Swiss-Prot record:
Pfam families: EMP24_GP25L (PF01105). Residues 1-22 form the signal peptide. Residues 32-131 form the GOLD domain. The keyword Protein transport applies. The lineage of its organism: Eukaryota, Fungi, Dikarya, Ascomycota, Saccharomycotina. Residues 23-186 are lumenal. It comes from Saccharomyces cerevisiae (strain ATCC 204508 / S288c) (Baker's yeast). This is Protein ERP1. It is a single-pass type I membrane protein. Residues 208-219 are cytoplasmic.
Length: 219
């Protein structure tokens, strides 16, 4: 029985492709909250967050407006003297994707940013961390790659069509040029033949007139 349970747990671990951690915490003002994650080189780290502010009239938390509330996220490599590798400023809700370039402990810091009275308002931050292999890209990345691939295929198709049209135009130009040269050649030979006929005719007429004048004793 125990062996069966262990096998079931092991099978579940194999099925799950990534580690997911979801939680929320409360803060006030622009308090910076940091979390530590051990990431190996090539690990894909994804964070999803949503900030809500406390409404006294509703006596509950509500979504913060995008115009007057934002969230700043920093990722630092603690093993490299807190080297800053990500600095992202977003709206009250959003996501972040990071690919670890080195193995070691990383510090993920979340800091709400607000203006006016919201800077002192009670804030609830919902956070979800997902850690997986870089081979398991997120759906947005795959969709973007598919879109770009489709655009490249369309461009290649258009380029091929343009090349075919250019080849057709070159073939038509070559045909027209050959036809023009043939017409010009025929016209030139026709002129030459006409000149020859005219010269022969003139010569024959001159000779005939000479004989005529001799008979008439004009010459």
């Amino acid at each position: 029985m125990l062996l069966t349970s262990l096998l079931q747990v092991f099978a579940c671990c194999l099925v799950l492709p990534a580690q997911v951690t979801a939680f929320y915490y409360y803060t006030s003002g622009a308090e910076r909250k940091c979390f530590h994650k051990e990431l190996s080189k090539g690990t894909l780290f994804q964070a999803t967050y949503k900030a809500q502010i406390y409404d006294d009239q509703l006596q509950n938390y509500r979504d913060a407006g995008a115009q007057d509330f934002g969230v700043l996220i920093d990722i630092e490599e603690t093993f490299d003297d807190n080297h800053l590798v990500v600095h992202q400023k977003g709206s009250a809700s959003g996501d972040l994707t990071f690919l670890a370039s080195d193995s070691g402990e990383h510090k993920i810091c979340i800091q709400p940013e607000a203006g006016g009275w919201l800077i002192k308002a009670k804030t609830k931050i919902d956070v979800e961390f997902q850690v997986g292999s870089d081979e398991k890209l997120d759906s947005k990345g795959k969709a973007t790659i598919d879109i770009l691939h489709a655009k490249v295929n369309v461009l290649n198709s258009k380029i091929g069509e343009i090349r075919r049209e250019q080849k057709l135009m070159r073939d038509r130009e070559a045909t027209f040029r050959d036809a023009s040269e043939a017409v010009n050649s025929r016209a030139m030979w026709w002129i030459v033949i006409q000149l020859i006929v005219l010269a022969v005719t003139c010569g024959w007429q001159m000779k005939h007139l000479g004989k005529f004048f001799v008979k008439q004793k004009i010459l």
